[in-house]
């Protein structure tokens, strides 16, 4: 096949053996199910109620039995051939268990009626179960399974109070916010009134009660964790196309739960330090908890530990494991030539009766010093293979010494530097942040060490204070605000960036046919075949041609998120992008069904990079088979608050887990010679007013928490593209931030790939290009860029730099 022939309007040629398509194939759907099983977390299992014994009879309660949520909404949605809910999954276990069908008929019919009336999956009302039906269920069995489901999506956050000023990008987003508030008077973190009534009835009526959480993120778990009338609970999250079957197989013992939490589950929403100001303003969010996010807060701040129901890294199994630290220390020449690392050698033995997997986690307790530190921070983890009863595995986990450094943004030790402060760096090994044992070895420093000297970037101007390790706050320097929306060519017309879905507005800026006069004498194939360099090719392009390449291009083929390139007179193909952190997203009207994989949070709960790489490889195959070039995933913002509507797209509250696992996803995707896109860069931790909300954060928290996963993946996994975020960061639009997109991303981290905006940002196109944002999506504003060029506000050199990065991505494709 000739170069780029997939992108030149050829049929979607199958990639599978014997001419079979891999998109939505049995193999990919099976992979989706197995990934979901590996990530689901057993939170509670008193009296070994699970797995269900052969011959068990069960009654299924809760609308979630049929109102199954495969994943979140917006760009994370996936068009699929079917969705297998919990009931359908359990029906396939008919040789092991039986189900009280009359109750299921009642729920099925009720949910069908609600869907017919316009209800969205996950947004239905919990129906009342008739007393007669309840009595029949009691007579049938003493075991009940309760399903609780939750749904959220792009463009709206989880909350219970209607914001009358919420100007959503699409009307659908406002509608969903209002519907959520109607269903959940106290917010959907908590149970609804109807859910509470149903649960109380079930507890009073059945001996054994099992809870399934089909949710996209953190919810209240205290209602079952401390209740002796509820014996078992499985955090099933949103499992994709076969999520119901994955949960069902675990319930009957066809597989052993090995997932671990990637977030801290607190007793109350108010226990999270981010809650009090999450909805304080539409215009800004103050990250006053600073680096104390998730377990870093709950394990450090006095009085916070008692607020935890299930800690970070927690998860039960049907078997038991013994985890022993054999030794720990500095990696030396006896093991490897690398002496800048520490290691922990750990033995894991399956001491129970079921085969299973365990996750070994290594945490560091740093000296508090002048900077203050979290009580523990994750530095390494590894999952065992499937261990049979009595079987052991010896593991050696290593990590960089310099990765234990902390960033000093105020000059308490050395300003704008990563510092290893003097003192003892203690090593803790175990199976959660709480279930750990201190190793015999500690890394001792007798003096401070500067590991990396940088310069100040993303300095806050309006963040009033930040939290310290003792729970108090320190005041931060303030500065005069600047007009960051100033434009040398006049303010941008708001109609370009606001209102209804902007596809129609984009049409005047798209090029649908040939007609541009060719300025240069060469073709892009001259670059491919080595006759000229890319620099030489780009130098021949006219200003208009350069500007054309700086913007998105119209959809072709099955795409619905627009493309890149599109200069046929130069042989430059129009290559397409695709949404979907949980699978390749193709619009339903196209008629192509892809594989819906588990949501990113569930994938993260596997703690298994091999699983993420396999999912990425499969998704990359589906992308390529459908003649798509750039997958707009993984999304790796941090779970700062349970309220973020897009948490299901993101991985964890911890940047190290996020970076390791999303990095594996990138490797898998790009093994197909198609591109992965890290997003949203950066600090897009809130959807409400996402195009204008200002994330006000300290430089230390930005670097140690919110940028760290991006840094890890850029340095280790070479993503082809990065998507800048809608929001502002300390008063500057992320898409226009030279500090972020050039100073940190390129100068410090050495990134050489392409940066794209999110779709229809409020940023000024020429300012985005100058800052290091190479591509404006879903379309550029060529007239404004040309006007800026004519006024001297942007140079040809700056445009050429971005065009070379865009063409560099296209040249990587086969």
Q: Where do the language-model regions lie?
A:
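Short beta-strand elements
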Residues: 435-456
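Glycoside hydrolase catalytic-domain context in secreted enzymes
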Residues: 1-435, 456-814
């Amino acid at each position: 096949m000739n170069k780029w022939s997939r992108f030149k309007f050829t049929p979607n040629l199958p990639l599978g053996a014997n001419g079979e398509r891999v998109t939505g194939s049995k193999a990919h759907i099976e992979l989706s199910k197995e990934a979901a099983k590996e990530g689901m977390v057993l939170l509670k299992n008193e009296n070994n109620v699970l797995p269900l014994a052969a011959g068990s009879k069960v009654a299924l309660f809760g609308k979630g039995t049929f109102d199954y949520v495969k994943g979140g909404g917006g760009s994370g949605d996936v068009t699929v051939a079917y969705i297998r809910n919990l009931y359908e999954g359990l029906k396939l276990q008919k040789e092991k268990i039986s189900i009280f069908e009359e109750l299921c008929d009642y729920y099925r019919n009720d949910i069908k009626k609600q869907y017919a009336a316009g209800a969205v999956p996950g947004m239905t009302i919990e129906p009342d179960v008739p007393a007669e039906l309840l009595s029949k269920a009691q007579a049938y069995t003493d075991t009940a399974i309760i399903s609780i489901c939750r749904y959220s999506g792009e463009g709206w956050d989880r909350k219970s109070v209607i914001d009358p000023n919420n100007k959503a990008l699409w009307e659908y987003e406002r509608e969903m916010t209002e519907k959520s508030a109607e269903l959940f008077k106290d917010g959907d973190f908590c149970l609804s009134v109807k859910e509470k009534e149903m649960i109380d009835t079930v507890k009073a009526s059945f001996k054994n009660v099992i809870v399934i959480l089909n949710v996209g993120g953190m919810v209240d778990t205290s209602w079952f964790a401390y209740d002796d009338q509820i014996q078992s609970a499985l955090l099933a999250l949103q499992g994709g196309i076969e999520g119901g079957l994955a949960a069902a197989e675990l319930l009957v013992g066809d597989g052993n739960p090995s997932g671990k939490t990637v977030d801290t589950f607190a007793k109350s929403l108010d226990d999270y330090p981010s809650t009090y100001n999450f909805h304080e303003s539409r215009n800004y969010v103050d990250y006053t908890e600073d680096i104390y996010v998730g377990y870093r807060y709950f394990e450090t701040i006095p009085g916070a530990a008692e607020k935890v129901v299930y800690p970070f890294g927690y998860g039960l199994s049907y078997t038991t494991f013994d985890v022993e630290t054999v030794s720990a220390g500095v990696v030396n020449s006896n093991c490897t030539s690398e002496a800048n690392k520490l290691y922990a050698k750990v033995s894991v033995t399956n001491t129970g009766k079921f085969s299973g997997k365990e996750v070994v986690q290594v945490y560091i307790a740093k000296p508090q010093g002048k900077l203050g530190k979290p009580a523990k921070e994750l530095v390494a983890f590894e999952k065992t293979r499937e261990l049979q009863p009595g079987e052991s595995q010896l593991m050696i986990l290593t990590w960089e010494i310099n990765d234990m450094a902390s960033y000093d943004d105020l000059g308490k030790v050395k300003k704008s530097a990563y510092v290893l402060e003097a003192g003892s760096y203690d090593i803790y090994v175990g199976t959660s942040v709480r279930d750990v044992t201190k190793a015999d070895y500690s890394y001792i420093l007798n003096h401070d060490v500067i590991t990396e000297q940088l310069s100040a970037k993303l300095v806050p101007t309006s963040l009033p204070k930040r939290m310290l390790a003792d729970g108090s706050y320190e005041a931060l320097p303030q500065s005069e605000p600047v007009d960051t929306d100033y434009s040398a060519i006049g303010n941008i017309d708001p109609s370009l960036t606001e209102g209804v879905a902007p596809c129609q507005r984009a049409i005047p800026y798209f090029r649908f046919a040939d007609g541009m006069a060719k300025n240069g004498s060469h073709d892009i194939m001259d670059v491919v075949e080595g006759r000229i360099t890319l620099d030489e090719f780009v130098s021949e392009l006219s200003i208009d041609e350069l500007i054309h390449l700086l913007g998105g291009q119209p959809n072709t083929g099955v795409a619905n998120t627009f493309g890149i390139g599109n200069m046929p007179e130069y042989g430059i193909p129009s290559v397409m992008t695709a949404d979907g952190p949980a699978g390749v997203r193709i619009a339903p009207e196209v008629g192509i069904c892809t594989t819906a994989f588990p949501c990113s949070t569930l994938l993260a709960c596997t703690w298994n990079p091999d699983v993420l790489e396999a999912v990425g490889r499969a998704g990359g195959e589906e992308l390529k088979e459908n003649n798509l070039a750039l997958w707009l995933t993984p999304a790796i913002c941090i779970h700062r608050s349970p309220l973020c509507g897009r948490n299901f797209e993101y991985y964890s509250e911890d940047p190290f887990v996020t970076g390791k696992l999303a990095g594996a996803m990138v490797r898998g995707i790009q093994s197909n010679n198609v591109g992965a896109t890290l997003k949203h860069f950066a600090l897009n931790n809130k959807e409400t007013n996402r195009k204008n909300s200002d994330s006000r954060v300290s430089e230390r928290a930005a670097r140690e928490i919110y940028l760290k996963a991006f840094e890890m993946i850029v340095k280790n996994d070479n993503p082809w593209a990065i998507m800048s975020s809608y929001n502002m960061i300390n008063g500057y639009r992320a898409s226009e931030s030279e500090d972020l997109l050039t100073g940190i991303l390129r100068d410090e981290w050495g990134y050489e790939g392409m940066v794209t905006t999110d779709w229809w940002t409020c940023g000024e196109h020429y300012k985005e290009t100058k800052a290091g944002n190479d591509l404006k999506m879903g379309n550029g504003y060529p007239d404004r860029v040309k006007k800026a060029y004519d006024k001297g506000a942007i140079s040809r050199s700056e445009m050429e730099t971005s065009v070379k990065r865009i063409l560099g991505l296209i040249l990587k494709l086969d």
